[in-house]
């Protein structure tokens, strides 16, 4: 018999840096999950993605056990790293804050493919290019 799902929720946690402080501790504690067990498992799974915030979907079962699925880092984090900037433009139509190449765009699209609602690389590149435009990042050849 399958375990009954009690709750499912999403968090964004820095890779390899999950600890019992907010937002992780309160989110797990109020659902009765062993916080340290989650932190150890998450940190072990994400230690190779350091420097990114990792979206994670946590499913809690009736016996207080849990499973979690990590997603790819947000497209904006990948774009900021590729462009070498700290944050996007406050006015992306007028102020361009960085540039990325077509090759970098394709690499980001390939990385994000499992999380995007497309299986076509060209469509994924267009989605990422839209994120670039809204951040004030130019795409150059």
From Swiss-Prot:
Alphabetical keyword list: Methylation, Ribonucleoprotein, Ribosomal protein, RNA-binding, rRNA-binding
InterPro entries attached to this UniProt entry: Ribosomal_uL11, Ribosomal_uL11_bac-typ, Ribosomal_uL11_C, Ribosomal_uL11_C_sf, Ribosomal_uL11_CS, Ribosomal_uL11_N, Ribosomal_uL11_N_sf
Keyword hit for Ribonucleoprotein: yes
CDD domains: Ribosomal_L11 (cd00349)
Molecular function as annotated in GO: large ribosomal subunit rRNA binding; structural constituent of ribosome
GO cellular component, one term: cytosolic large ribosomal subunit
Pfam families, per database record: Ribosomal_L11, Ribosomal_L11_N
Post-translational modification: One or more lysine residues are methylated.
Signal peptide from the UniProt entry: none
Protein's UniProt keywords contain Ligase: no
NCBIfam families: L11_bact
Functional note: Forms part of the ribosomal stalk which helps the ribosome interact with GTP-bound translation factors.
Record text on subunit structure and interactions: Part of the ribosomal stalk of the 50S ribosomal subunit. Interacts with L10 and the large rRNA to form the base of the stalk. L10 forms an elongated spine to which L12 dimers bind in a sequential fashion forming a multimeric L10(L12)X complex.
Protein name in UniProt: Large ribosomal subunit protein uL11
């Amino acid at each position: 018999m399958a375990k009954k799902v009690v709750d499912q929720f999403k968090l964004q946690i820095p890779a390899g840096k999950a600890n019992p402080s907010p937002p992780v501790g309160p989110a797990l504690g109020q659902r009765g999950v062993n916080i340290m067990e989650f932190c150890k498992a998450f940190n072990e799974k994400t230690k190779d993605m350091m420097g990114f915030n990792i979206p994670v979907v946590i499913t809690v079962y009736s016996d207080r056990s849990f499973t979690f699925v990590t997603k790819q880092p947000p497209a904006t984090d990948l774009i900021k790293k590729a462009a070498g900037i700290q944050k996007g433009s406050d006015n992306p139509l007028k102020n361009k804050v960085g540039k990325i190449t077509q090759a970098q765009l394709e690499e980001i699209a390939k990385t994000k493919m499992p999380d995007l609602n497309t299986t076509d690389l060209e469509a994924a590149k267009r989605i990422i290019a839209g994120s670039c435009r809204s951040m004030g990042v130019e795409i150059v050849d």
